[in-house]
């Protein structure tokens, strides 16, 4: 079956804190399943903890490379978390719009993250010391321009207001978005703490992002899986390579890409 054989190739753009590694795919089992149904897949290869603007440059160059090597006119971007912000910047500020047919954002904090707002209240010296440790760590794993301090501050609700004013949607690009929510703090042991903080001030969330923050363009809905454990930020990219009752993440992406194909993208 070629139900995922879209007119334009797929560009998968990862979120913060990860790289596109050969032996550990950020997207878990998803790319293999998409390829099985005919998808032509590429990766953003941007840095783990660089700023939005820096990563956007990587994405812009990757789009140019794909178009040049394949002869295609455009790409379909599917971006998770911060990757959605990086992609929006590349499209609207760096001139990638003519080469992008669609942008699908998954659990992207378009309107910021309240957990980051609280984290930014840490003493300046302490925050910069923590940032220095992260920068050193990620520089050893391939980042040439890690900037934990700036990158994390770009997730604040205040920064998101400025970002959205400066990075307007590009005419001619189709924007759509998805969100998910955890049932409770036990749904994902990796995200129980930020989940509780955000739950107290903003309500339901995926452990990092609320549905309200994830909405951008045509909002396709919130995946809740209410009768079971809910779906966390990491679950949406098959981080743990686990199957959850009531939600098949690979099937979700197959349907997503199938719909893009049906729209002519």
Predicted segments with their positions:
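Short loop/turn segments at strand-loop or loop-helix junctions that form parts
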Residues: 13-16, 46, 106, 180, ...
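C-terminal catalytic-base region of ester-bond hydrolases, centering on the histidine
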Residues: 165-265
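Cys-dependent protein tyrosine phosphatase-like superfamily
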Residues: 1, 5-8, 101-102, 126, ...
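Hydrophobic/aromatic beta-strand patches that form the interior of the parallel beta-sheet core
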Residues: 11, 42, 104, 176-178, ...
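Serine-dependent carboxylesterase/thioesterase catalytic core
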Residues: 14, 41, 57-160, 206
